[in-house]
Amino acid sequence: MGGCVGSHHDSSGSLNENSDGTGVALGRNQPLKREKPKWKSDYPMTDGQLRSKRDEFWDTAPAFEGRKEIWDALKAAAQAFESNDHELAQAIIDGASITLPHGALTECYDELGNRYQLPVYCLSPPVNMIEEKSESETIEVPEAPASEGQECQLRLRLSTGRDLRLAVRTSDSVQQMKRRLQTQEGVAATSQRWFFSGRPLTDKMKLEELKISRDYVVQVIVSQPPTTPPLPQNPTPVEN
């Protein structure tokens, strides 16, 4: 998934040199290259699944090593880079004093020598992306009869920071459980993205197929419409 580890320094205090004998130190800063990484996912991925994977990384990466303000800067730089705003991405990197030994966001260092690694899926979509069906094209999943499956409590952790238990049946599909959460908490089913152990859960998956133990937590990413930041106001001059 990528992450942050301590950088490796030699006895002179500089980063180790390349093994090709060029003598170019890995710690020497290089400008951000414009080329985006090309990669293929292990399975065809929709835009929603890619967003879930990215959200999971950015939600958990700062919890390991490194400084949160650097992770925030790297996230902003990655978003600008993917949007082809190369100048903004470079400005963010320079402003946070981030070093790129290879000119790529896949390996970065802060001023303290901490190493940060961004996975390629945070920088560009895979070559095997597939279109996500619109709501009108989505096949309705029939509700399971109330007599089918066993009743149980499913532990959920919402991206809003709330933990809760949801009354479900083992025969429920993910789509049906989304509707139950919508009824209980008022969270629109279409704005929910569920994943368990880093795996996106599709609407047709059945709870009994997922083999989720009682003590495990299913994470729910709730998509929220972007808010427009308020325009800065001119400060009122202070009279002497």
From Swiss-Prot:
Residues 1-48 are annotated as: Disordered. Keywords: Cytoplasm. GO terms for cellular component: cytoplasm. It comes from the Eukaryota. InterPro entries: DC-UbP/UBTD2_N, DC-UbP/UBTD2_N_sf, Ubiquitin-like_dom, Ubiquitin-like_domsf, UBTD1/2. Residues 152-227 form the Ubiquitin-like domain. It is found in: Cytoplasm. Its main location: cytoplasm. The keyword Cytoplasm applies. Residues 12-21 have a biased composition (Polar residues). The keyword Cytoplasm applies. Residues 32-41 have a biased composition (Basic and acidic residues). This is Ubiquitin domain-containing protein 2.
